[in-house]
């Protein structure tokens, strides 16, 4: 009978676990641990719910007697909130010891990932969005909430379940098969609280601590864009290399301390020293100070005890009617601001030896054993990102893609005037430790197969190893790289150079994450941004289904029309329509074409029609790969001649989809890349599109393959690849104007030398003409680019929430075609294409000849110098000119026509080089500033000449006009 007592207690305390459904995977991973009796320390709590009075009750959430088998094990267990009506958590009491537990996290959600008594957290924490309510580590004392403040749970809007995550770092305490029932006790009340508590997490995800480095700083900063919050407690968290963590509110340049603490002290939630309120427009800033002394290899951010973390938890309350339960900051939007951070943030806090409570598994011996695992090649985010998930703070990092995570490394030992130059842009890579594969893909930044299941699952942050590949600090300025590093970068051809327009105030607009930029028919800049929404690791689950629907659509205008001269907002729209904006294009009629990666849809919007979208492609919130669905589509291009719609689809699919002007599916092409050398037509995140109507080509920024691929719009045949080592591993966006192709790359990977920057290329041969960077701020994740035909370029950055304007040092129309890097041959080819199209469809032999002229462009190892090419081109012209003048002089003497002006072929030759010859090199048409469509090939079908070419009727139509492509047969659909 006595032997049955433990079994009866199990049934009484955890009756639901006996009836719960268990997946085969979860049963396999539990090693029969649930069949063992609880240890004596687990028998103290036989009633998980204990009434306190008529309105209050206590809830005991404990692990059900678990025995971890290996270090860095993460176990999760769930408990349903015992009341259906709304309740409020007003107190927490930890039930754990540092002897067995590294740290604990308590989440609130509506559906846990498992219904078993407990499970490995790599199976997921919650299937929906999870909000962190409490975090504990290092024998921290209880957290006390102010009177009238509570975490809202239950009811229609609150969480239905608590999910406890426990990280067991060292398992030496379990060598004798001891069991653990660590957890947390909650005090809840049914009485409504006027103030609702929440958590603001500031977290670095890609800091690298070099071995032997005495001081390494990791900085985090974000703009606060919400209703006022009142900070009442904070908690810092690093592993054993952390010396001090400081958090501040920055308002009008003034730094106000939120909290500063040594992470080697008990990691409790400490009360703030004085009341701190944070209002809309303030900046929140945090700095973690690390040391790499004593290490023989670099230390990265990650989930194991041998890795590091840089987290600042800010506990706050807000008025109930405006309350937001969880907010995050994983960026550094104002790195230069840290030059004025109070000196105290750089001073470690002394800790007495008896106060330092470290696990034995923090010893260097075990650290060295684990390092090789962290040095395996990893893939980049993305947010991903890629990125990182805020939950990694606590446990493990998630990979993030496109527009989400970055950290700047700051060295305070350098002189103040050079501090801003030491800001490092770090590309982080997050990948599951046992995947054993390397794959570049961002934001967030998706991995395919098992990697996708790990990274995009917002709560699948356990048993992941976050390995970072940061670049070394480099100077972000307009200068050439040191000798040997920049052999790929050509000298500026002549005086052709892009420079930031330093007098343009648009750089200070500070919208949300800038995902798209375009130019409308009036040459106004149009910005597509995400407002207060961000794409991070908890945005999507493993099936790419958006997880933050409860936040609702973005409540501010997401489309801004900006005056290109003074950056004034002329018009705004897009409120309550989008969740995660991405691509923006504008067609020849001024319609906006946008994509939303959360909705998995493409929208056509008439800026003058306030009644809603004109056309919608895809199914709302339904990812897919058939003719009626998209999966995180990235960009749209519309052919100005045929009206054909091209969609790059996208992060989950690897294809280009074509639709008719009415939205009927026509065809698709492309497939996922395989291997390290992707073939033509293979993509890894087709991220940006640029149409070249004149040549009938569609170019694609194959982002994670670091290249540009061009295809024929009529046959979908691969034409060529543009790839340079200076691109690095990513090409984020491209934009085309006649003769030129513009592009921006992404953050460098660890060990790479290529910085993030903009490129100008000769479209005819793909050679780089110019490389440029901003002066004010710096590129972090330049997400989109658009160029106008006068050479003005705008670039939007998804991390710094910034838009830059760049202009040419001189007007192109006053520059020789050689100086601009555009060859006469390209113009002649374009003229031939246009003339042929206007007369008849090209024959197959003609198409073959045209294809032969456009060879596959790889970066040349050695090429003919530009000066030599220019000389070879100029010599025949000079000789022809001399012969013509001599003949004319002889004729003048023979016939006495000394007053006759030169009207011969020599004049026509000169006319061609001045852009005045009919059908010649019309630079005025190529580069004159006029109202047109310059976003990604939306070129105006104009028959007007510029002011300097009015006498040359038809010259512009010959160069700009592209006859509509023949309609595809209905069978192709």
From Swiss-Prot:
Modified residues annotated as Phosphothreonine in this record: 943
Q: How does it sit in the membrane?
A: Single-pass membrane protein
Q: Where is this region: Peptidylglycine alpha-hydroxylating monooxygenase?
A: 1-494
Annotated region Disordered: the residues are: 937-973
- Peptidyl-alpha-hydroxyglycine alpha-amidating lyase: annotated segments: 495-817
Q: How is its activity regulated?
A: PAM activity is inhibited by EDTA, phenylglyoxal and diethyl pyrocarbonate. PAL activity is stimulated by cadmium and inhibited by mercury.
Q: What is its EC number?
A: 1.14.17.3, 4.3.2.5
List cystine links: 42-181, 76-121, 109-126, 222-329, 288-310, 631-652, 699-710
Entry binding sites for Zn(2+): 582, 687, 783
Which residues of this UniProt protein bind Cu(2+) 1?
102-103, 167
What is one Gene Ontology biological process annotated in the Swiss-Prot or TrEMBL record? peptide amidation
Q: Which family does it belong to?
A: In the C-terminal section; belongs to the peptidyl-alpha-hydroxyglycine alpha-amidating lyase family.
Identification of the protein by name: Peptidyl-glycine alpha-amidating monooxygenase
The organism named in the record is Homo sapiens (Human)
Source taxonomy:
Eukaryota, Metazoa, Chordata, Craniata, Vertebrata
What gene does the UniProt entry assign to this protein? PAM
């Amino acid at each position: 009978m006595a032997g049955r007592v433990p079994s009866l207690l199990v049934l009484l305390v955890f009756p639901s676990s006996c009836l719960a459904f268990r997946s085969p995977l979860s049963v396999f991973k539990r090693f029969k641990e649930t069949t063992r009796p609880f240890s004596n320390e687990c028998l103290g709590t036989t009633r998980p719910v204990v009434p306190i009075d008529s309105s209050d009750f206590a809830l005991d959430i404990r692990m059900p007697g678990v025995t971890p088998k290996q270090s860095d094990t993460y176990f999760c267990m769930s408990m349903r909130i015992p009341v259906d009506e709304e309740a409020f958590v007003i107190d927490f009491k930890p039930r754990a010891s540092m002897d067995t537990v590294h740290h604990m996290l308590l989440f609130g959600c509506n559906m846990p990932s498992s219904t078993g008594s407990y499970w490995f957290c790599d199976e997921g924490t919650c299937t929906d969005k999870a909000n962190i309510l409490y975090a504990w580590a290092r024998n921290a004392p209880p957290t006390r909430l102010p009177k009238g403040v509570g975490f809202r749970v239950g009811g229609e809007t609150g969480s239905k379940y608590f999910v406890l995550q426990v990280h067991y770092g060292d398992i030496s305490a379990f060598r004798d098969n001891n069991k653990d029932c660590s957890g947390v006790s909650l005090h809840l009340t049914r009485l409504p609280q006027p103030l609702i508590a929440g958590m603001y997490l500031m977290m670095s995800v890609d800091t690298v601590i070099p071995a032997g480095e005495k001081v390494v700083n990791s900085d985090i900063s974000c703009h606060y864009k919400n209703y006022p919050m009142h900070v009442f407690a904070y908690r810092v968290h690093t592993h054993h290399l952390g010396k001090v963590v400081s958090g501040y509110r920055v308002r009008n340049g003034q730094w106000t301390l939120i909290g500063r603490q040594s992470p080697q002290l008990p990691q409790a939630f400490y009360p703030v020293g004085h009341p701190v309120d944070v209002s809309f427009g303030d900046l929140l800033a945090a700095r973690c100070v690390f040391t790499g002394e004593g290490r023989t290899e670099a230390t990265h951010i990650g989930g194991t005890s041998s890795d590091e973390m840089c987290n600042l938890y800010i506990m706050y309350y807000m008025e109930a009617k405006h309350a937001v339960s969880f907010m995050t900051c994983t960026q550094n939007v104002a790195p230069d601001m840290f030059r004025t951070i109070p000196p105290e943030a750089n001073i470690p806090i002394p800790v007495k030896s008896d106060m330092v409570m470290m696990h034995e598994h923090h010893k260097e011996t075990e650290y060295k054993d684990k390092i090789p695992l962290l040095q395996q090649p990893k893939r980049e985010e993305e947010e991903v990102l890629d990125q990182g998930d805020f939950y990694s703070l606590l446990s493990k990092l998630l990979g993030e893609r496109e527009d989400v995570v970055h950290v700047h490394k700051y060295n305070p030992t350098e002189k103040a005037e050079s501090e801003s130059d030491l800001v490092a842009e770090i590309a982080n890579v997050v990948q599951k430790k046992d995947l054993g594969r390397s794959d570049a893909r961002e934001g967030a930044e998706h991995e395919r197969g098992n990697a996708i299941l790990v990274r995009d699952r917002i709560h699948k942050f356990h048993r992941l190893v976050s390995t970072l590949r940061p670049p070394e600090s480099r100077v972000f300025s307009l200068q050439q790289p040191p000798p040997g590093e920049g052999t790929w970068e050509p000298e500026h051809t002549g005086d052709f150079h892009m420079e930031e327009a330093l007098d343009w105030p648009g750089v200070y607009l500070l919208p949300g994450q800038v995902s798209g930029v375009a130019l409308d028919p009036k040459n106004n800049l149009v910005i597509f941004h995400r407002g207060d929404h961000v794409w991070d690791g908890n945005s999507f689950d493993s099936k790419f289904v958006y997880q933050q629907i409860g936040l609702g659509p973005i409540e501010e205008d997401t489309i801004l029309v900006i005056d290109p001269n003074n950056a004034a907002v002329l018009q705004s729209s897009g409120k309550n329509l989008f969740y995660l904006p991405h691509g923006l294009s504008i067609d020849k009629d001024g319609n906006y074409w946008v994509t939303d990666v959360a909705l998995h849809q493409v929208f056509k919007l008439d800026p003058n029609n306030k009644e809603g979208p004109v056309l919608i492609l895809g199914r709302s919130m339904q990812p897919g790969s058939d003719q009626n669905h998209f999966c995180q589509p990235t960009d749209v291009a519309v052919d100005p001649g045929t009206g054909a719609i091209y969609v790059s689809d996208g992060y989950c699919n690897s294809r280009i989809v074509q639709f008719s002007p009415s939205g009927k599916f026509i065809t698709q092409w492309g497939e996922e890349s395989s291997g390290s050398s992707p073939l033509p037509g293979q993509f890894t995140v087709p991220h940006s599109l640029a149409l070249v109507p004149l040549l009938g080509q569609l170019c694609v920024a194959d982002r994670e393959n670091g290249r540009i691929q061009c295809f024929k719009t009529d046959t979908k045949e691969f034409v060529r690849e543009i790839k340079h080592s200076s691109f690095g591993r990513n090409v984020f966006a491209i934009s085309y104007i006649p003769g030129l192709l513009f592009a921006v790359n992404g953050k460098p990977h660890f060990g790479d030398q290529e910085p993030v920057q903009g490129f100008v290329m000769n479209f005819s041969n793909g050679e780089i003409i110019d490389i440029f960077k901003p002066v004010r701020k710096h590129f972090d994740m330049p997400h989109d680019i658009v160029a106008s035909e006068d050479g003005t370029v705008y670039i939007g950055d998804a991390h710094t929430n910034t838009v830059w304007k760049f202009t040419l040092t001189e007007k192109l129309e006053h520059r020789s075609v050689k100086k601009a890097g555009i060859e006469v041959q390209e113009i002649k080819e374009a003229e031939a294409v246009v003339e042929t199209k206007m007369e008849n469809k090209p024959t197959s032999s003609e198409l073959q000849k045209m294809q032969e002229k456009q060879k596959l462009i790889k970066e040349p190892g050695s090429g003919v110098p530009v000066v030599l090419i220019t000389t070879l081109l100029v010599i025949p012209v000079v000789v022809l000119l001399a012969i013509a003048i001599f003949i004319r002089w002889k004729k003048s003497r023979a016939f006495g026509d000394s007053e006759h002006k030169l009207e011969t072929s020599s004049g026509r030759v000169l006319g061609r080089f001045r852009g005045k010859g009919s059908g010649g090199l019309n630079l005025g048409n190529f580069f004159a500033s006029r109202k047109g469509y310059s976003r990604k090939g939306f070129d105006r079908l104009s028959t007007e000449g510029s002011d300097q070419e009015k006498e040359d009727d038809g010259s512009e139509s010959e160069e700009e006009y592209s006859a509509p492509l023949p309609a595809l047969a209905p069978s192709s659909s």
